Amino acid sequence: MKKYALKINKKYFIFFLSIYLLMLSVFFFTSIGTESYRFLLNMRRYFPVAVAATLALFYWNYYDFPVKKILPDCFVGLSWIFTHNILDYLAYRNVSTNINNFFDIAFGGYVFSLLVFLRIFWYLVIKRPSKLIDFIFGFIQTALLLFPLIELVYFSYYHTTISTAASIAFLQSNPNEMKEYLLQNIGVLGIFCFIAGISMLCIFLIKKNKLEVPAKISSAGFRKNKRTFLVLLVLIISISVYLPKCFAGTGIMHSMLGAKQYLDNAKKFEKYHKENFDQLQVIPSTNKFSKPSTVILVIGESAGRNFMSAYGYSANDTTPWLRKSIEKDSTHFLRFNHVYSSYGSTMQSLERALTEKNQYNNKDFSRSLTIIDLAKKAGYKTYWFSNQSVKNTADTPIQLIARTADVAYWIEDGNENNRILYDGDLLPCLKKVNANENNFIVLHVMGSHELTLHRFPPEFTRFGTVGVFDLVSNYEDSMAYDDWVLQQIFSYARENLNLQAMVFFSDHGANPYRKRVADNIPFINLRIPLIIYLSDEYEQLYPQTTSVLIEHENQYFTNDLMYELIGGILQIKSNHLDEKNDLSSKEFQFTRDTLKTDLGRKNIKDDYNENKIE
């Protein structure tokens, strides 16, 4: 008896190990740019999934159900584990630097377990075969298989997975548009075959679910199965509580929910934006440049001033052009030495930096005016060029702001060659700008965003080894590459667009020596650069603004006040600008003691050693 039990235990241990290694292998081989700590995190995440699946098999065998009758549930689970991850990898392996899908794998494992637990549970309750249960489970299995099937059909047609953009198009379509799309792209025969195929699959699964109730259940009283009944109930409730969150994180649902969030935010933003824009009163300066001119704002990504040689970083010359420009021409290149981000991630930081909303007024984003609005009202033609991902639903507020520009363009949209894009690919966009107009240009770079190894061309490697992953040297190389990009932007704009002012700041900082954290963000991740170039003509035309900015180079500042600073640099007076928040104004009210960061949870004054790299 003991020998038999040991054999059974070995069988389940092998099954557990097989499922666990399968999930880890799928994640590992279909991921790109995944740091080791994320892999370790998923080792922990998939452990309970494998335990649940093993318990499902154990209880199925314990009650002598035929093993072949569990195959429909296995097929459903495996479809979720494999489909999205493999298709996403095939679609983006040559163009993406970060593929990190893990929810589909966990969802597949949990769905398999839950289906098995539920079937055993219901047979423990009714103790007899049931056509209704066969039908219900066959229908549920078919519904669950629809998601991987739709992804397979979509991939076979478009050679990519369902993106947020595709989901937005779907949610915006009315029934007639959807009908026309299906008829045009699939045709009546295709629609008929798909419906017929799904119907046949459902009938097949219903038949496969049909089984006889084993004697262990049909002839046993409730008391004998009481313990198993309670264990199954706990397992079913536990998985059911977590499963909706897991489902929301799967590839197809992440795209759909992201699209819904975007459309909801867009609806709110559009509802108030026109009204707010109409009410915006702007009084531009009476002093005019001698000919049409350009102001440029470059938004950096994850650029920490502690790692910039322009701010004293000595390990390597990571920003040689900025450093030399400031050293040789400090009257035109102004370096602000005590600037912080309002938060350690892009969306929360920039939705404040680019609008009236800040840490101190906590204004609703959807009711806030933007830097684009200010520039438009002041008579500038507005441009937004971005190397950020347009598929990134986390950047929804930023995309909403960007799309209000006269010209908004994401270079990802024009990536016909399916290659990795670098910030240097933004440079041709400047040639689209008309030099005979007053222009306000925003360039949103990828900067030093994870994974930094892919933020610069291999031939640009200066401090590391070509193609070798190293957090610190890759981060330094990404900083050096963007320093070169800034130089090219500056040179082209000064020679061709009558550049009068150029502002560079970052959404937040980073620390390549430490993994990124979402909570209790350390100060090093909040310390950012702010560098402003002013032309000779600008300084002669606006001497007061120039002198105030020079005086404020050692003033403390947070980037959620960039909206007012841009308004000040554009020489705008408005009913939607507060001079007390404007670093270019003598009225600027904030000091080291009053400024906050981390969305108001931290005081800047508590950063006792700004130069320390923790």
Name every feature range the model reports, one short phrase each.
Residues G77-I81, A315-N316, N498-L499, F504-P543, ...:
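Histidine-centered active-site microenvironments of extracellular/periplasmic hydrolases
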Residues Y4-A52, L57-C74, L78, N94-N101, ...:
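Membrane-interface soluble catalytic domains
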Residues I296, Y481-N520, Y563, G567:
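Metal-dependent active-site segment of extracytoplasmic phospho-/sulfohydrolases and closely related
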Residues E356, G414, L471, Q544-I550:
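Flexible glycine/proline-enriched surface loops and loop-helix/loop-strand junctions
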